[in-house]
Each structure stands twice: as C-alpha cells, then as structure tokens.
From Swiss-Prot:
Keywords associated with the record: Cytoplasm, DNA damage, DNA recombination, DNA repair, DNA-binding
Name of encoding gene: ruvA
Organism: Rhodospirillum centenum (strain ATCC 51521 / SW)
Domain II as annotated region, ranges: 65-143
Region ranges (Domain III): 154-206
Name used for this protein in its record: Holliday junction branch migration complex subunit RuvA
Length: 206
C-alpha cells in the first residue's frame, strides 16, 4: 500500500499529476484543489495517497491534506460515488464547504460537481448527514425541519426557522446555515428566531 509520495513534480494535467520518486514517475489522480496547491514542475512535492487495486488496474489518488483524503474515503462509501465523482466533489467544494453543505442538506451545492445530479446528491445527503459531525459540523437537526415539515421545538427549531428565513431572502442554504449556526453559538440557547435572523444578516454582510 502506497500511503504517501514525496518527490519532484514532473508534470500536471486537468485531473492528474506525475510525481518523480527516485526516477520512477507515479501517475496520481487528484482534485483541482490539490493540483492548485502543488509546486512548479521540477520542485519538491508531497502527497498523501490512496491506492485502489483491481484485477486489471492500479490507481493512485493524491491529496494535499488529511482532511481531503478523509472526505474522499467517506464519499466513496456512498453507492454511486466512485473515485471520479468524489474528486469532482472535492474540486467543486472544499472540505469545509462539503461539511456545511451536507449538514445543511444543501442539494444544490453538491450538484455543482460534474457527475452529481439531484438523485445522487440526495443520496449523499441522506447517507452522510449523521457522519459529518466527525468533520466538525453542527448537528443535522439544526438544519432540518421536523416531521410534517415543521421545525423542531427549542434552539434547533429557532436555527432552522432562521435559516429558512435567510434562504427566502435569497441567500444560499449552506451560507445561511453556516452564518446562523455561528451566531447561535455566540448568542446561546435563549436566542429567538428574530435574534438569529438579525445576527445572521450581520454575519453575511460584506
């Protein structure tokens, strides 16, 4: 198992890089985010890697950091998400944006990635919504309505209502969710919906 490559960058393409390690060139598939962070050809690079072995192929996938690698592993546990789609998601959204998008159940954000349609996005949201807490996301209950479409009672309900209000004002769900959860942590459980909306708007102001 190859877990890390350290060598000289030979060349790059739209979704790959070749790393020269002791005179051997390793072809590594990578996200656009990782490729942007690489040094110039001829300079030293270091990539964390995942190696997939099949009957007729060996593939290496490279990552700039452990967070992106861990997201790749998690995404590929979802049915219908192969390595290519996982890298497309990591190209379209940073790990932090992925975390917040899934916690906020923001299907539109996931559909920015090539190869991700509404049905696959919904499956990703459903299968990973309980797992994003390990990546530092707020509890999913804060972003979703209760049974029958009503927001849950208590602080989570106030957060959900405030997020919905900001979305109705034209903000993207993921940015509304991120802003409201940030101010909810500062204001505490006594904050009402109107308090969260006002503070959320200030958080979103440039």
């Amino acid at each position: 198992m190859i877990a890390k490559l350290t060598g000289l960058l030979d060349s790059t393409g739209l979704d790959w890089a070749i790393v020269d390690v002791g005179g051997v060139g390793y072809l590594v598939s990578a996200s656009a985010r990782t490729l942007r962070r690489l040094a110039a050809p001829g300079e030293a690079v270091s990539l964390l890697t995942e190696m997939w072995v099949s009957e007729d192929n060996i593939q290496l996938f490279g990552f700039a950091d452990t967070e992106e690698r861990d997201w790749f592993r998690l995404l590929t546990t979802v049915q219908g998400v192969g390595a290519r789609v996982a890298l497309n998601l990591l190209s379209a959204l940073s790990p932090a944006e992925l975390t917040n998008s899934i916690a906020a159940q923001d299907r539109t954000a996931l559909c920015q990635a090539d190869g991700v349609g509404p049905k696959l996005a919904a499956r990703i949201l459903n299968e990973l919504k309980e797992k994003v807490a390990s990546f530092g996301a707020p509890a999913p209950a804060a972003a979703t309505a209760g049974k029958g479409g009503a927001a849950p009672a208590g602080p989570a309900g106030a957060v959900a209502d405030a997020v919905s209000a900001l979305v109705n004002l034209g903000y993207r769900r993921v940015e509304a969710f991120t802003a409201v959860n940030a101010v909810a942590q500062r204001l505490g459980p006594e904050a009402g919906v109107s308090d969260l909306i006002r503070a959320g708007l200030k958080e979103l102001s440039p």
